[in-house]
Amino acid sequence: MEYNTSELCDLFADSVDVVDPIFASFGGRYSFGGEITTVKCFEDRGLIDRVLAQPGAGKVLLIDGGGSSRRALFDASSAQVAIDNDWEGVVIYGSVREVDSLAELDIGVLAVAAIPVNAECESVGEVDLPVNFGGVTFLPEDHLYADSTGVILSPEPLDLD
């Protein structure tokens, strides 16, 4: 499904939060949304890969990587795992790599930066906890909507009918 965050902000101004404009789009899908699952980790991607291996239909993985631009938490192989498990998209408060390959894949990917250095893979981190960045607190099961204009967050799914 395609989303227009500008229109959603007009329609649901009192019930959405707008995330600060800190992200660039790296995936081949520019509009995506769904219920979020959160991961908090720092320069370690092992837990991310484990979560993406689970069914993700209608979900967006939201990663708080501390905003690090020293190591990439997500790449084309992670994106393929996400696609294979039906995730709608991934939002990373951190970095990605293999950006040319990511751009060819049908998944939404937003991140702060790109760097060629891979993160560790020791599965250090936490899943399904509140995280805060971009001027917003993200709670597990909140609903995120993203497009080329921005990212918005709602505690409930928005009635788009």
From Swiss-Prot:
The keyword Cytoplasm applies. The keyword Cytoplasm applies. GO terms for biological process: regulation of RNA metabolic process. Gene3D superfamilies: Ribonuclease E inhibitor RraA/RraA-like (3.50.30.40). Pfam families: RraA-like (PF03737). One of its GO terms (cellular component) is cytoplasm. Transmembrane segments: none annotated. GO terms for molecular function: endoribonuclease inhibitor activity; enzyme binding. Globally modulates RNA abundance by binding to RNase E (Rne) and regulating its endonucleolytic activity. Can modulate Rne action in a substrate-dependent manner by altering the composition of the degradosome. Modulates RNA-binding and helicase activities of the degradosome. Belongs to the RraA family. Homotrimer. Binds to both RNA-binding sites in the C-terminal region of Rne and to RhlB. This is Regulator of ribonuclease activity A. It comes from Alteromonas mediterranea (strain DSM 17117 / CIP 110805 / LMG 28347 / Deep ecotype). The lineage of its organism: Bacteria, Pseudomonadati, Pseudomonadota, Gammaproteobacteria, Alteromonadales. The gene is rraA.
